[in-house]
C-alpha cells in the first residue's frame, strides 16, 4: 500500500521520486606505447574541472587506468560496480587500447560515453602528445565491430573543462537510458472507440527494454471501489484544497478524486514488480465518467507532478514520451493535443508584430485538464465541457483548467507507428504570453516553421495528435536519447531552405 505523505510539487520545486540518480564512472585508458601517466594526469585534471564547475555528485573517478589489458578492464568494471556507478565515461587520455576500452563498454552494465583529451600545449608535443584524436577513430570502429552503443559528443576531443561539459551533457541522456531499462508502463482499458490514433504496437516497447502491464478498466473500477472510505483520503483532500486555493470550484468531487489517486498509487506499488519506475496510460472516456462519476484529469496532473506521468486516452507511447521528458528535464511535463489553429483576429491582435512568428507558426495545444497547476498561469477545477454536451455535468467534474504559463517548450514524441516501426520527432518553441480565451488546459504555442513541420512530419509520417511537452529547450538531449535507443528516424522542424523529402519545391 502506498504510504501517503504530503509532497505535491510546489512552484520552484523539482523533487520527483520516479527516476534514477545517475553516477558516471570516469575510466582513463592508455595505449601501452604511451606514458600511462599522461592518461592518469589528464583524468585527474578532468575530474578536478568537473568538480570545480558541477560538484562531484554525478561522477566517480575510477583509480584503475586500463593499459592494453583485459585484466585491467575487469578490475575497472568491478571497481565501478562497488562504487555504485550506473553509467560510464571512457576517457582517452592518449591513443587508448582499442580492444580493452571497448570491452569495458561491453562488460559494463549501463549506458556509456566516450570522450578524449586534446593536446595541451605546443611546448609539449614530444613526450606529452597523446594522439587521442586518432584513438577515437579506432575506438568507434571497434564499437561497431562489437555492435556496441556509446554516446559520442558532437566534437568528442577537448580540454579538461570541455570534456567536463561533455560529461555533464551526458547526465540526462544516461538518466533516460537507465530509467527506460527499469520502466514498466501500466495501462488501463483499450483505447476509446474511434481512436485508432492511440494504437500502440507493444513490440517496440520490448525492443526498448520497457515492460508493459495491460489491464481492464473493470480491474481499475474494482480497485477504486475497494478504496471507498480509505483513511488516507482526508489528507489528500486537504492537499488538493491547498493546491487549488481559490480555484477550488468543485469541492464536492475532491473526495472521489482522492480515492482515485490512492487507487492508482497503490496499484503502482503492488504491480511495478521487478521494475523501479512506472508510467501510466489511463482511460478517461467514454464509460469512465458514467461509472466513476468524475473525470480523472486533475489526478493525472497531480501524479505527473510527482514524476509518474499519466497519459490520457490509453496513449501508451504518449506515457512513454512523457516519462522520457520527465527524466531528461527533471521537471514536470504534460501531454497535449496538437489541437486547433489560432484565429486570424487573435493573431493580428496579440501576436503579429509582438513576436517573431508567422500565423502558420502558431497553434493551440490543448487537453481537457491534465496539466499540473505549477505549469499553468492560473487554474480552476472545472468540468469537462466537451463531454458535458452529452452527459450530466456532475459526471464530468475533475478537469484542471487554465492557460499554460508562457515560456520555452519542447514538443516531442516517440512512437511505434501504424507500420510498427519506431520513429520520433522533436521541435523546440515556446508558449506565448497570449490569453487563449478558451477552455481546458490550453496554450498558444509557436514553433518556427510549424506549418511545414505539421504537414511534412506530423501528417506525412502518420503521427497521432498527442504530443509530449517539456517545459524548456531539451531537443539536444532528447535527440541523443533517441539516437542511443536506435531510433533511425528523428524528425525536427526544418528551417526555411531545407526541404522535407515530400515537400513540393515549386509550392
Which ranges hold each PLM region?
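Short, Lys/Arg-enriched N-terminal segments with co-localized hydrophobic residues
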Residues: 1-15
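N-terminal basic/disordered segments at the start of proteins
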Residues: 16-52
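Cap/lid and interdomain-hinge subdomains that line or gate substrate/regulatory clefts
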Residues: 17, 21-24, 57, 116, ...
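Periplasmic-binding protein-like
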Residues: 85-94, 113-115, 277-282
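Long, internal scaffold/assembly segments composed of regular secondary structure
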Residues: 237-328
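C-terminal catalytic subdomain
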Residues: 304-436
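Extended hydrophobic packing segments that form well-structured cores
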Residues: 385-507
Amino acid at each position: 500500500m502506498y504510504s501517503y505523505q504530503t509532497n505535491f510539487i510546489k512552484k520552484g520545486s523539482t523533487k520527483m521520486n520516479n527516476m534514477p540518480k545517475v553516477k558516471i564512472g570516469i575510466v582513463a585508458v592508455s595505449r601501452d606505447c604511451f606514458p600511462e601517466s599522461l592518461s592518469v594526469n589528464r583524468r585527474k585534471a578532468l575530474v578536478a574541472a568537473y568538480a570545480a564547475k558541477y560538484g562531484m555528485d554525478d561522477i566517480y573517478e575510477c583509480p584503475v587506468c586500463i593499459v592494453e589489458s583485459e585484466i585491467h578492464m575487469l578490475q575497472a568494471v568491478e571497481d565501478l560496480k562497488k562504487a555504485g556507478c550506473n553509467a560510464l565515461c571512457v576517457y582517452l587520455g592518449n591513443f587508448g587500447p582499442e580492444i580493452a576500452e571497448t570491452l569495458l563498454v561491453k562488460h559494463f552494465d549501463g549506458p556509456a560515453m566516450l570522450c578524449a583529451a586534446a593536446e595541451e600545449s605546443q611546448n609539449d608535443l614530444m613526450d606529452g602528445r597523446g594522439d587521442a584524436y586518432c584513438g577515437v577513430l579506432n575506438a568507434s570502429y571497434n564499437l561497431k565491430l562489437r555492435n556496441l552503443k556509446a554516446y559520442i559528443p558532437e566534437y568528442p576531443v577537448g580540454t579538461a573543462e570541455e570534456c567536463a561539459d561533455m560529461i555533464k551533457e551526458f547526465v540526462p541522456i544516461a538518466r533516460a537510458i537507465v530509467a527506460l531499462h527499469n520502466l514498466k508502463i501500466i495501462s488501463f482499458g483499450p483505447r476509446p472507440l474511434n481512436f485508432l490514433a492511440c494504437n500502440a504496437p507493444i513490440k517496440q516497447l520490448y525492443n526498448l527494454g520497457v515492460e508493459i502491464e495491460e489491464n481492464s478498466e473493470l480491474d481499475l473500477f474494482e480497485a477504486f471501489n475497494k478504496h471507498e472510505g480509505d483513511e488516507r483520503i482526508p489528507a489528500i483532500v486537504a492537499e488538493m484544497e491547498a493546491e487549488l486555493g481559490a480555484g477550488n470550484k468543485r469541492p464536492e468531487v475532491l473526495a472521489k478524486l482522492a480515492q482515485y489517486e490512492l487507487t492508482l498509487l497503490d496499484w503502482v506499488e503492488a504491480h511495478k514488480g521487478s521494475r523501479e519506475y512506472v508510467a501510466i496510460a489511463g482511460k478517461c472516456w467514454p464509460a469512465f465518467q458514467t461509472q466513476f462519476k468524475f473525470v480523472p484529469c486533475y489526478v493525472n496532473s497531480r501524479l505527473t507532478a510527482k514524476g509518474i506521468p499519466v497519459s490520457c486516452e490509453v496513449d501508451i507511447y504518449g506515457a512513454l514520451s512523457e516519462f522520457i521528458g520527465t527524466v531528461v528535464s527533471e521537471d514536470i511535463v504534460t501531454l497535449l493535443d496538437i489541437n486547433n489553429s489560432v484565429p486570424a483576429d487573435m493573431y493580428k491582435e496579440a501576436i503579429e508584430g509582438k513576436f517573431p512568428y508567422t500565423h502558420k507558426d502558431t497553434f493551440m495545444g490543448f487537453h481537457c485538464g491534465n496539466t499540473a497547476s505549477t505549469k499553468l498561469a492560473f487554474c480552476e477545477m472545472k468540468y469537462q465541457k466537451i463531454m458535458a454536451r452529452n452527459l450530466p455535468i456532475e459526471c464530468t467534474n475533475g478537469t484542471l483548467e487554465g492557460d499554460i504559463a508562457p515560456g520555452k517548450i519542447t514538443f516531442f514524441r516517440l512512437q511505434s507507428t501504424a507500420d510498427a516501426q519506431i520513429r520520433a520527432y522533436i521541435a523546440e518553441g515556446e508558449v506565448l504570453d497570449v490569453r487563449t480565451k478558451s477552455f481546458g488546459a490550453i496554450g498558444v504555442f509557436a514553433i518556427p516553421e510549424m506549418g511545414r513541420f505539421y504537414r511534412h512530419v506530423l501528417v506525412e509520417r502518420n503521427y497521432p495528435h498527442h504530443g509530449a511537452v517539456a517545459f524548456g529547450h531539451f531537443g539536444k538531449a532528447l535527440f541523443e536519447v533517441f539516437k542511443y535507443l536506435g531510433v533511425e528516424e528523428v524528425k525536427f522542424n526544418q528551417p526555411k531552405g531545407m526541404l522535407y523529402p515530400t515537400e513540393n519545391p515549386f509550392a
